[in-house]
């Protein structure tokens, strides 16, 4: 067994992963996991008490994390004319219109988030089968369909992220790097949790935050006590 494997096993023997921990305790457990050669991402997986088959219970939105994600985003902007020039000036990594649409149709998706001006959505909408499954489709609800491309780019650079429940009612979101201070990780997770609670559909009945787990890229999943999160 490798040294990394032995340390993971030591963590697993020290803690009971069948029980929930407070958010602070869960973060501390991740921090105790063995170091690797890269800065691991802290991921959140939330099972929501919704029925995604119902149109009024499909969860999708965005939230600005107070400390960002620690990830340098590759931002693509669908725009033409003056708006394209604004996007370039604002630091977008890829800017274009029909040329980008055709490139993506060919299978290219080497970017992390897409922004589009409203006039581009007729063409961008044709990319649904490519962008949709990858959560890359711009939407008004997430603020990525907008005439103010400069503001959208700035917000994304500062740590604005999107969240979306899948067909099983689960949201999976990267919220920080493990190198962040514990307090920074905690505040980012609390911001996401508050946004999820705010997005709760009026028609959703019963327990809303069914299961809440945090993990690092190479570490174990730690269940967080949802009673603490609901009380935020």
From Swiss-Prot:
Keywords: Repressor, Ribonucleoprotein, Ribosomal protein, RNA-binding, rRNA-binding, Translation regulation, tRNA-binding. Pfam families: Ribosomal_L1. One of its GO terms (molecular function) is tRNA binding. GO terms for cellular component: large ribosomal subunit. GO terms for biological process: regulation of translation; translation. InterPro entries: Ribosom_uL1_bac-type, Ribosomal_uL1, Ribosomal_uL1-like, Ribosomal_uL1/biogenesis, Ribosomal_uL1_3-a/b-sand, Ribosomal_uL1_CS. Binds directly to 23S rRNA. The L1 stalk is quite mobile in the ribosome, and is involved in E site tRNA release. Part of the 50S ribosomal subunit. Belongs to the universal ribosomal protein uL1 family. This is Large ribosomal subunit protein uL1. It comes from Chlamydia muridarum (strain MoPn / Nigg). The gene is rplA.
């Amino acid at each position: 067994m490798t040294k990394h494997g032995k340390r993971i096993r030591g963590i697993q023997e020290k803690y009971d992963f069948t029980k929930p921990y407070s958010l602070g305790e869960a973060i501390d457990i991740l921090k105790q996991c063995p170091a690797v050669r890269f800065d691991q991402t802290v991921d959140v997986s939330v099972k929501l008490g919704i029925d995604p088959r119902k149109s009024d219970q499909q969860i999708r939105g965005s939230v600005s994390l107070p400390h960002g994600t620690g990830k340098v985003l590759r931002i693509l902007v669908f725009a033409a004319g003056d708006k394209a020039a604004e996007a370039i000036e604002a630091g977008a990594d890829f800017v274009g219109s029909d040329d980008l649409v055709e490139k993506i149709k060919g299978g290219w998706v080497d970017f992390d988030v897409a922004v589009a001006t409203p006039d581009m959505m007729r063409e961008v909408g044709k990319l649904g089968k490519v962008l949709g499954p990858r959560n890359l489709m711009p939407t008004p609800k997430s603020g990525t369909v907008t005439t103010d491309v400069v503001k959208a780019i700035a917000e994304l650079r500062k740590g604005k992220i999107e969240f979306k429940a899948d067909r099983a009612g689960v949201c999976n979101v990267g919220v920080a790097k493990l190198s962040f201070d514990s307090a920074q990780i905690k505040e980012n997770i609390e911001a996401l949790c508050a946004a999820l609670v705010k997005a709760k559909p009026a028609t959703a009945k019963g327990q809303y935050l069914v299961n809440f787990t945090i993990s690092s890229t190479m570490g174990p999943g730690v269940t967080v006590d949802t009673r603490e999160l609901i009380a935020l």
